[in-house]
Amino acid sequence: MAFAVLLDQVGSLGRFQILQLAFLCIANILLFPHILLENFTAAVPGHRCWVHILDNDTVSHNDTGTLGQDALLRISIPLDSNLKPEKCRRFVHPQWQLLHLNRTFSNTSEPDTEPCVDGWVYEQSSFFSTVVTEWDLVCEWESQKSVVQSLFMAGSLLGSVIFGYLSDRFGRKMICSWCLLQLAISDTCAAFAPTFSVYCSLRFLAGSCVMTIMGHSFLLVIEWTNPQSRSMVTTLLLCASSVGQMLLGGLAFVIQDWRTLQLTVSIPIFVIFLSSRWLVESARWLITYNQLDKGLKELRRAARINGKKNAGEILTIEFLRSAMQEELDAARSQASIFCLFHAPRLRMIVLYLGFVRLAVSVPLYGLIFNLQYLGRNIYLFQVLFGAITATARFVALLVMNYMGRRISQVLFLLPVGLFILVNTFLDQEMQTLRTILATLGAGVLCIATTSGSVHFSELIPTVLRGTGGGINILFSRIGAALAPLLMIFVGFSPYLPWITYGVFPILAGLVVLLLPETKNLPLPNTIQDVENDRKETRKVKQEDNCMKVTQF
């Protein structure tokens, strides 16, 4: 924890940290659209069966007389229960007699129908083309659309664990750069995918990178900043993700061809990858892993950018060894993923944080699915949701700095549960009130998740922060997968899934109370920092290190 002393020497929030933060914010803005891309590239437009008499360009007007499109549609496509044209069936033969019958007249004999053996005709008012129209993922193949999102989520789950572990072994910058390259290549190739299976495979590879890059961007910022600034930089990075949501809505509105949209959001990632060479590795991680020469080099680089001219004389190998002696001694025993669950206090923290992340993800994704019924303009909704979450992030910053990490989460998690429970029992006709409550719930959940992200980074030690982040994302992905599965309970009661969504954040709020407060405390570097009485240990060490700095 003596790294705070080193930060004071090089500048804990100067030009260096601002430049690093600005670059990673831009990266997050360009990265987040890749997570929600299937909202547009895999959207399902209105469709019906292809009909020879209606859609064959070689059929002359003389063959159909003076009949208009509506009349031809009526004799070719049966109506569903809502008196809308069927999406997956057509008449075997044109039913001319229907032209002389009232729509609601029930005939004694039902005309023969058949599946869409000749394909489908798609509406192009909202989407010119999507992967659904490209490979006809409708009707009996409709479930294939969810395969893309499931594989992307599976890739995210697997990548967060693997790359999280590797980042604790080989550094944040190296893994972040590799993931940027992998994402750029895989999603660019996805724009030219010849088959649906190839497209799914490429999106799986992309999914394994996106959350890893975003998670490591937090590490590369918070491990270079002082305790007072961590909540602010975390909030700014999360706000960048919200801006990315709004950017995606605007791009998708302008570019309605899925391949062009896929390519448009993928090419800039190559630029981010090439620019990542100027990222500075976490000196905290380098020193904790006994790479003193490299750590000293990065510290001097940060001091030079921050204008700390005298820092070069103070920052020496001997000074690093003296200030970080306890951390260096602890680094001799290599930490592994098993250490997260071996040390009793750390195990308790990891499990509590994991449950909170899971319990927040379940209602968050449940509300996202519900918010999609705000209207038919999906582009406007995407921009609106980004604006709501961005506003919520700034509210979170104010509350965190005033009330601390723990109380701020409890303050917002409990009302979320109440919003959902009240919404569950409101009459379906009260759409305006239901929409307001759902939107408030989503915004308040974003406040809680922002505070939770800061809380997590301040509880897990540096030697395992990447691995711990992977485990935390794993719990988040499990919660995201549970959200739609809970709708199975509708078969027992239409209220049961929503009651479950409401109970989860209430339980999460109670569990947060079991976690220690971390406001304005230095980051733990080793497992011993977490296991010991942290507040007392930190106070003594800071006083001792101040004496060492004075001596130098």
From Swiss-Prot:
Where is the protein situated, by its record's location annotation? Cell membrane
- InterPro entries assigned: MFS_dom, MFS_sugar_transport-like, MFS_trans_sf
Q: State the function annotated in the UniProt record.
A: Renal transmembrane organic anion/dicarboxylate exchanger that participates in the reabsorption of conjugated steroids, as well as bile acids, driven by an outward gradient of dicarboxylates such as glutarate or succinate. Transports androstanediol glucuronide (5alpha-androstane-3alpha,17beta-diol 3-O-(beta-D-glucuronate)), estrone 3-sulfate, and estradiol-17-glucuronide (17beta-estradiol 17-O-(beta-D-glucuronate)), but not taurocholate.
Q: Which domain of life is it from?
A: Eukaryota
Question: Main localization of the protein?
Answer: membrane
Q: Which UniProt keywords apply?
A: Cell membrane, Ion transport, Lipid metabolism, Lipid transport, Membrane, Steroid metabolism, Transmembrane, Transmembrane helix, Transport
Entry similarity comment: Belongs to the major facilitator (TC 2.A.1) superfamily. Organic cation transporter (TC 2.A.1.19) family.
Query: Transmembrane region positions?
Result: 16-36, 146-166, 174-194, 204-224, 235-255, 260-280, 349-369, 380-400, 407-427, 436-456, 473-493, 495-515
User: Which SUPFAM superfamilies does the entry link to?
Assistant: MFS general substrate transporter
Alphabetical list of PANTHER family matching this protein: SOLUTE CARRIER FAMILY 22 MEMBER
| Assigned GO CC terms | plasma membrane
Could you tell me what reaction this enzyme catalyses? estrone 3-sulfate(out) + glutarate(in) = estrone 3-sulfate(in) + glutarate(out); 17beta-estradiol 17-O-(beta-D-glucuronate)(out) + glutarate(in) = 17beta-estradiol 17-O-(beta-D-glucuronate)(in) + glutarate(out); 5alpha-androstane-3alpha,17beta-diol 3-O-(beta-D-glucuronate)(out) + glutarate(in) = 5alpha-androstane-3alpha,17beta-diol 3-O-(beta-D-glucuronate)(in) + glutarate(out); dehydroepiandrosterone 3-sulfate(out) + glutarate(in) = dehydroepiandrosterone 3-sulfate(in) + glutarate(out)
Q: How does it sit in the membrane?
A: Multi-pass membrane protein
Name this protein carries in UniProt: Steroid transmembrane transporter SLC22A24
GO molecular function annotations of the record = transmembrane transporter activity
Q: Name one GO biological process term.
A: steroid metabolic process
User: Sorted alphabetically, which Pfam families does this protein's record hold?
Assistant: Sugar_tr
